[in-house]
């Protein structure tokens, strides 16, 4: 559940929190500025995404410090500038982003809660739920790389990553241990209830 994850982060100490959407967006922009291509699985590495049956412990890339690391088997963790498992292994809950029942995209950077209360409505995400390879992104300046429409394949076009935007749901970022080519820095699944819990989310 996102509330449980939020509290666990706070319990780490003063200043700790879940990733919020604007921080995610900033990191995505840093990546695309540095590499100039959205297919991060070819630019950096697959991540822990291919035919794995369960999560593995974090820390697999500590030996690399803050250096970026990746490889091609899909059996090892990746790291981008010290951010381990930016995609692959388990998803991350993301705070400060919510798609309401009318598919309005609500974004906030403080006062995080389970209903999007007090968040800014930046625009409507569309007339129906959407999922698949991110072919087009929302046109609103603050929406970042949130999916607008899908098409093509994860290996050949668009953002090369999977996206979901479903009414009334919260986002999870990054891809799980068997996501395959749909994993990457832009994979954002807005398809999970605030009370949802599963192994691929950690809590």
Predicted regions and their residues:
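Disulfide-stabilized, aromatic/cysteine-rich ligand-recognition loop
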Residues: 2-3, 7, 14-15, 19, ...
């Amino acid at each position: 559940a996102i509330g449980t994850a939020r509290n666990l982060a706070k319990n780490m100490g003063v200043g700790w929190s879940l990733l919020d959407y604007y921080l995610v967006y900033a990191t995505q922009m840093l990546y695309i500025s540095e590499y100039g291509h959205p297919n991060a699985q070819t630019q950096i590495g697959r991540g822990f995404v291919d035919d794995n049956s369960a999560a593995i412990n974090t820390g697999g890339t500590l030996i690399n410090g803050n250096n970026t690391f990746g490889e091609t088997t899909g059996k090892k963790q990746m790291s981008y500038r010290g951010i381990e498992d930016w995609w692959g292994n388990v998803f991350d809950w993301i705070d400060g982003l919510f798609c309401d029942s009318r598919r309005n995209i609500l974004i906030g950077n403080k006062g995080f809660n389970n209903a999007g209360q007090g968040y800014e409505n930046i625009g409507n995400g569309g007339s129906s739920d959407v999922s698949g390879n991110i072919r087009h992104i929302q046109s609103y300046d603050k929406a970042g790389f949130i999916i607008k429409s899908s098409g093509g394949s994860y290996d050949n076009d668009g953002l090369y990553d999977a996206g979901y935007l479903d009414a009334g749901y919260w986002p999870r970022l990054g891809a799980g241990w068997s996501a395959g080519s749909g994993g990457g820095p832009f994979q954002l699944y807005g398809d999970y209830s605030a009370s949802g819990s599963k192994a691929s989310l950690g809590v």
